[in-house]
């Protein structure tokens, strides 16, 4: 049974109460003391972590690469259970980042959402993104408005936010907002010549 928007609001209020109590008891924001703008290397014992700033799912996405282990932590740059919401994403750069990752020496991706996969999953994920981009571009070429594209373009449901046995998920109305935000972002970037 889908959750109602009211239930989701109540759930969010419930989840925020502990944070509100922390603020009431003198909690304060402590800014980071170590930052980076492009790349950074960290070591934990003999384990090397390479952090890379990339514009992709967000303007401030971070990839974490463990070269000795040949593991890449991708955040939402790669997801294995559907396409994340693309609202606010840097779509052209995202495709470029996926191309860069093809050249990197690793075997395992730990995605932002979903189970770890082999590097060979990268082309599949990139193709899923490009398919949605082309669906929107095709409809725009046929003169469809954004509202008509909302009605006409559908793709694999956003399984990232759907309810499962283990996870309560978002209500259907919120998932629909994510879908429309994705289509709107693609539409606007194509319209501006950014994609």
Model-derived regions: residue spans:
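Accessory terminal helices/loops
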Residues: 1-21, 103-105, 116-195
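Alpha-helical interaction segments
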Residues: 26, 83-85, 149
